[in-house]
Amino acid sequence: MEPPDAPAQARGAPRLLLLAVLLAAHPDAQAEVRLSVPPLVEVMRGKSVILDCTPTGTHDHYMLEWFLTDRSGARPRLASAEMQGSELQVTMHDTRGRSPPYQLDSQGRLVLAEAQVGDERDYVCVVRAGAAGTAEATARLNVFAKPEATEVSPNKGTLSVMEDSAQEIATCNSRNGNPAPKITWYRNGQRLEVPVEMNPEGYMTSRTVREASGLLSLTSTLYLRLRKDDRDASFHCAAHYSLPEGRHGRLDSPTFHLTLHYPTEHVQFWVGSPSTPAGWVREGDTVQLLCRGDGSPSPEYTLFRLQDEQEEVLNVNLEGNLTLEGVTRGQSGTYGCRVEDYDAADDVQLSKTLELRVAYLDPLELSEGKVLSLPLNSSAVVNCSVHGLPTPALRWTKDSTPLGDGPMLSLSSITFDSNGTYVCEASLPTVPVLSRTQNFTLLVQGSPELKTAEIEPKADGSWREGDEVTLICSARGHPDPKLSWSQLGGSPAEPIPGRQGWVSSSLTLKVTSALSRDGISCEASNPHGNKRHVFHFGTVSPQTSQAGVAVMAVAVSVGLLLLVVAVFYCVRRKGGPCCRQRREKGAPPPGEPGLSHSGSEQPEQTGLLMGGASGGARGGSGGFGDEC
């Protein structure tokens, strides 16, 4: 069995199907229109920005419009575009006086050149697609501007730490930014956490101003209750600003210091340069007494001298300095300084004293004069006296060699080596830069002391006649001795370098037999006596003529050589005309032998030796060639 309404349902189904077919066949039956619009767009001031509005899907015909939402809520239309076929027809309606004006590009996007703070609005894109419906989307435009350099104006007055409430410290300015920057304060690089509500310890106030350009300027004023520790503190402020994409920046101001007023708590009083660690100053120096209190600003100082428990005021100034030109021993004593600070606490000691001690050293006095003459081998005592404060120390030296400490110098069994300059030096151990000296010259009177020497000496018996020798005599004494030689030619006496008091003379001569017999004497003399020395040479050998011996040896050698040559020549030419002629002239009578005795050979040899030398003289053609 069918339900009662079955026929009605059966009859309605074909109608619904037909309606669906008709709607599907209608050209305006399309999907719902949707838009792609970025909800937030960020840009830096002065840069260009493009707001995108893209319909999704395919629509042959639609109308795109851009609206601006102003502060009153009104929505003036800026531009529109109509899609006809494949092209978009653009129409600008209201530029709102913007320069450069708004523009639509070929894709229906809204273009804002050189973005300004006034462009920071909501921009609405509306697309009407007929039967597909109408879509609307909003893009929020934020324009960012970096503020100018942060400026700070500190309080240039004198701020008292005795105030029990916060005082104005400085004002910080950050101008022409967007959005409005934030200002923070710093002391010695550490951020100050100060509230914005007024309280005695510190707070800050802020004020934001919109400039004619639409940019924002922020002013912050800092108030603090100051302490004495803030006298050396450095303060500054910083502006924190925002940038696109969630970034941030910071601009710090220059640092500054405050001028504070605080009472004196401690006073110092001392002797300035020059002074020694023990507190002494030298007589004649320029001395400064320095007084300093730790209050600010600098208080007034009263400098005085105590004499018989009475104050003698010497100077009153704001520097706390007292200068004593060319200080003398009479200025030794007690000096004082008082700080005139009426804001100081009752238990603070505002007065200080010190003891000025002037060191002095008078010229030294010797018991002897500048020159002391003493006989050889005698003794003497010299005293050195001095007055000074603190007690001086005395020391004796000679040629920088220490001799002893104390005022007395004892000289005993003096010799010529004792001659020289003796120095008494006085010094103050606690004042190293203060010292004096006094000296005297010791002259030892006595007969001369003599020393002799030979240059290249030889042992006894090694001298030969004609050998050259240099003799040297050296002497010392006082008065200076004179040097003389027993022969002429001695050099003048001259001081010996590096040997104080010694003079020297030299004599160069040739050794002879007479010198060997008599010797050479050198004598040193002065009014106290003389000393004499004789140089002896021992046995002197006669000089052999080496040249004559050499000539004789050569002559003998040449003669023997000529004799051998002559004999050899005659043997080779035996029987020749020359030999026969010689035999005719000098042959013995017949029957006598050629050599009758041993002595008959010598004349012939002599003749042979002489023939070579005399034959040429006799005939001009002689020589060994004419005689055998």
Curated annotation (Swiss-Prot):
| Record localization | Cell membrane
Q: Which GO terms describe its cellular component?
A: collagen-containing extracellular matrix; external side of plasma membrane; extracellular exosome; extracellular region; plasma membrane
Does the entry feature the keyword Glycoprotein, yes or no? yes
Ig-like C2-type domain span: 274-355, 363-441, 448-541
What keywords were assigned to this record? Blood group antigen, Cell adhesion, Cell membrane, Disulfide bond, Glycoprotein, Immunoglobulin domain, Membrane, Phosphoprotein, Receptor, Repeat, Signal, Transmembrane, Transmembrane helix
Per its UniProt record, what Gene3D superfamilies does this chain match? Immunoglobulins (2.60.40.10)
- InterPro entries the record matches: CD80_C2-set (IPR013162), Ig-like_dom (IPR007110), Ig-like_dom_sf (IPR036179), Ig-like_fold (IPR013783), Ig_sub (IPR003599), Ig_sub2 (IPR003598), Ig_V-set (IPR013106), Surface_Rcpt/Adhesion_Mol (IPR051116)
Expressed, tissue-wise, as follows: Wide tissue distribution (highest in the pancreas and very low in brain). Closely associated with the basal layer of cells in epithelia and the endothelium of blood vessel walls.
A Pfam family this chain is assigned to:
C2-set_2
Location (main, coarse): membrane
Q: Mind telling me how this protein is modified after translation?
A: Epinephrine-stimulated phosphorylation of Ser-621 by PKA enhances adhesion to laminin. Ser-621 can also be phosphorylated by AKT1.
Q: Which GO terms describe its molecular function?
A: laminin binding; laminin receptor activity; transmembrane signaling receptor activity
Complexes and interactors: Homodimer. Interacts with ITGA4:ITGB1. Interacts with spectrins SPTA1 and SPTB1.
For this entry, the protein name equals Basal cell adhesion molecule
